[in-house]
Amino acid sequence: MINDIKKTAESKMQKTIEAFKHTLAKVRTGRAHAGLLDHITVDYYGSDTPINQVANVTLIDARTIGVQVWEKNMAAKVEKAIRDSDLGLNPMSMGEVIRVPMPALTEERRRDLTKVVKGEAEDARVAVRNVRRDANNDLKTLLKDKDITEDEERRAQDDIQKLTDKYVAEVDKLFAEKEKELMAI
């Protein structure tokens, strides 16, 4: 029972870290990467479809993304979707290929992005702590039902606290790396 609670807690904490990494990947730095456009959708015959399902997204160079549309009639829609996204990108259409240059980040924009990342990091820390709280509540329930002793509960709580510390430290490390990446010119 205790091991199940620990395994569930660790699994949920790991998923929180993965979600945080995914969120960090969306935050634009000065460099281009193909995953930057993954969350942008385009109207494809009446349904919202991610860009990577209607085109090849590749890197042309460190500061330019190339989008090779599979159907010529989709080029204008894809270009508009990229332009209208919240990323502040200005795509240029060249037939079937759309070039998306990455504008240099201003100091002010870097600070704003750092604040956004800091907020996301705090949300991830809170999520990890909520998993700890839920696991500790499950342990208290087992103790109330006399399924475990107080010593077992205390040991399990200590183990869960160690897991929490480990995953909060991981969030802090990821945040520090992203902050350094954002502030690098």
From Swiss-Prot:
GO CC terms: cytosol
GO molecular function (one): ribosomal large subunit binding
UniProt keywords, alphabetically: Cytoplasm, Protein biosynthesis
Protein location: Cytoplasm
Keyword Secreted listed: no
Superkingdom of the source species: Bacteria
One family name in Pfam for this protein: RRF
GO biological process entries: cytoplasmic translational termination
Listed SUPFAM superfamilies: Ribosome recycling factor, RRF
Function, in words: Responsible for the release of ribosomes from messenger RNA at the termination of protein biosynthesis. May increase the efficiency of translation by recycling ribosomes from one round of translation to another.
UniProt xrefs under NCBIfam families: frr (TIGR00496)
Family under the similarity heading: Belongs to the RRF family.
Protein name: Ribosome-recycling factor
Gene: frr
